[in-house]
C-alpha cells in the first residue's frame, strides 16, 4: 500500500519507518527542507532504540522517502497520516492549527478517494473538523479516521511492530477495511483491532494517558505519606501492585512525569471537559501533584545544607525518561533552574539529551562527557533520570571524586543497604533517609 505521512517528528518518523518495514511504500512530508535533506541522506533526526537500523534499511531499499511537497506525497496514495504537533495553548487546549491547515490544503489538491488518518493526539471532535476542512474544497469521496498512537518513547519500535491494541475510529466500513488491511501484519498474534466511532477513539487516547499520569501522581502522594509515617514506598508499591486489578506498572515514585504526552494530554482533557462545563477534579489534582513533585528534592537539599550558594552539583540525567533524547517537560530542567537560582553550579551528564538541553539552557550548566566526570569536586549528586548505566555505579570511585558523600536520588535507583554500606548520606523518594 502507498502511504503518505505528514510530519517527521517522533510519531511521524517512527510510524513511517515501521510501515515501510512491512513492505508499504511510504513517503513522509515535512515543510523543513533542511530536515528533509538530512533524512533523505540517511541522517536520522531523533534517538529511539532500534529505529535507525530500520530507517536506513528502508531508505536504502526505496520504501521510505522524504519530500516537502504534499502534492507529491499524496499522488497515488491510499492513506494519508497526519502526524503533526498539537502543542498546548496558554489555556491548556490543543492547538490544531497545523492539523487543520494541512486538512485545508488536502481539500484543495485531492483528486480521488483517500483515507485521512489523525495519528496526532487530538481533542474529541477533531475528525469532524478535519472532515469539514477537507470538504470545504473537495467534493469527492474520502474518509477521516482517528487512529491514536500508543508509543512509549524508548520502546516505540516494539510498540509499533507488536502493539497491545490498535484503535481505529471511523464512520464507514470502507475506511475500516483499508485500515484493517494496513495493520494486518502487526496483529498476527491476535492483538485486538478495536473498531469504534471517531469521537470514542479520540477520547480513548486522552483517557489512557491521563489514567497513567493519575497512577504516577497517586503513587507520588503515597510516597510523601510514607515519608511522614515512616513507611517504605517500595514495600507499599509491591504490595499494591501484586493486586492484578491494579497491576505493577506506573507505580514507581519519583520526581514527576514529563515528556511530550502526559503533561499535554492531561491539560487538554481538563480543557475539553471545561468546554462542556465539566470540572475534571481528579486530573486537576494530578497536575498539581506533578508540579509539586518535580521540586520534591529541593526541600531535602535545603534541609541538609541550609544554603547551597557556591555548591557544585553533579546531575545525572536530563531526558524526561531513559532511552530517549526527549527533554520536553523533563524534571531535570526544573532542577537546573532551581539549583542555579539558589547559587549552585551544575555539572550535568545524560547519554543522549545533552545537546538538546544545551540548545535551550546554554551555559546554565556545564555538560560533562561521562557520569563520573560530573562528580569531580562535586558537593553532592542529584539523580533525575533512571538511565540503566546509573543503576550500578562504582561507589568507591564516586567517593574518591566527590567532596561530600551525599546523594539525592529522584528515581530510587539504589538499595538503602547498598548506600549505607558505602557510607553515603542518601535521600530518596518515599523511603527512610540514610545519614
Per-region residue spans from a language model:
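Structural/interface elements that position substrates and couple domains in central-metabolism enzymes
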Residues: 1-435
Amino acid at each position: 500500500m502507498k502511504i503518505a505521512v505528514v510530519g517527521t517528528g517522533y510519531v511521524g518518523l517512527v510510524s513511517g519507518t515501521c510501515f515501510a518495514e512491512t513492505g508499504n511504500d511510504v513517503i513522509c512530508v515535512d515543510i523543513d527542507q533542511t530536515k528533509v535533506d538530512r533524512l533523505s541522506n540517511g541522517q536520522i533526526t531523533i534517538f529511539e532504540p532500534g529505529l535507525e537500523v530500520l530507517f536506513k534499511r528502508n531508505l536504502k531499499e526505496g520504501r521510505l522517502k522524504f519530500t516537502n511537497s504534499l502534492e507529491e506525497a499524496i499522488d497515488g496514495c491510499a492513506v494519508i497520516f497526519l502526524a503533526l504537533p498539537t502543542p498546548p495553548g496558554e489555556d491548556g487546549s490543543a492547538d490544531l492549527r497545523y492539523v487543520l491547515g494541512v486538512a485545508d490544503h488536502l481539500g484543495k489538491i485531492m483528486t480521488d478517494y483517500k483515507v485521512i488518518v489523525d495519528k496526532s493526539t487530538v481533542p474529541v471532535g477533531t475528525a469532524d473538523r478535519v472532515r469539514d476542512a477537507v470538504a470545504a474544497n473537495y467534493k469527492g469521496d474520502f474518509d477521516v479516521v482517528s487512529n491514536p498512537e500508543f508509543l512509549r518513547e524508548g520502546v516505540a519500535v516494539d510498540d509499533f511492530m507488536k502493539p497491545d491494541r490498535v484503535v481505529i475510529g471511523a464512520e464507514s466500513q470502507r475506511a475500516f477495511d483499508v485500515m484493517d488491511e494496513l495493520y494486518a501484519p502487526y496483529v498476527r498474534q491476535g492483538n485486538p483491532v478495536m473498531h469504534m466511532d471517531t469521537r470514542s477513539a479520540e477520547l480513548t487516547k486522552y483517557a489512557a494517558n491521563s489514567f497513567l499520569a493519575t497512577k504516577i501522581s497517586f503513587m507520588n502522594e503515597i510516597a510523601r505519606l510514607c515519608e511522614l509515617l515512616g513507611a517504605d514506598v517500595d514495600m507499599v508499591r509491591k504490595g499494591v501492585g501484586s493486586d492484578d486489578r491494579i497491576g505493577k506498572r506506573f507505580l514507581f515514585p519519583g520526581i514527576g512525569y514529563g515528556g511530550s504526552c502526559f503533561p499535554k494530554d492531561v491539560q487538554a482533557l481538563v480543557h475539553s471537559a471545561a468546554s462542556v462545563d465539566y470540572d475534571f477534579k481528579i486530573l486537576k489534582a494530578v497536575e498539581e501533584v506533578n508540579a509539586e513533585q518535580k521540586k520534591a528534592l529541593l526541600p531535602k537539599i535545603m534541609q541538609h545544607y541550609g544554603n547551597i550558594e557556591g555548591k557544585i552539583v553533579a546531575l545525572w540525567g536530563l531526558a524526561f525518561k531513559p532511552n530517549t533524547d526527549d527533554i520536553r517537560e523533563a524534571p531535570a530542567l526544573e532542577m537546573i533552574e532551581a539549583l542555579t537560582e539558589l547559587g549552585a553550579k551544575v555539572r550535568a551528564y545524560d547519554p543522549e539529551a545533552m545537546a538538546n538541553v544545551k540548545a535551550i539552557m546554554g551555559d546554565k550548566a556545564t555538560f560533562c562527557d561521562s557520569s563520573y566526570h560530573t562528580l569531580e569536586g562535586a558537593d553532592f549528586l542529584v539523580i533525575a533520570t533512571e538511565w540503566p548505566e546509573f543503576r550500578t555505579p562504582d561507589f568507591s570511585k564516586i567517593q574518591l571524586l566527590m567532596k561530600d558523600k551525599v546523594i539525592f536520588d529522584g528515581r530510587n535507583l539504589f538499595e538503602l543497604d547498598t548506600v549505607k554500606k558505602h557510607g553515603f548520606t542518601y535521600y530518596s523518594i518515599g523511603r527512610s533517609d540514610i545519614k
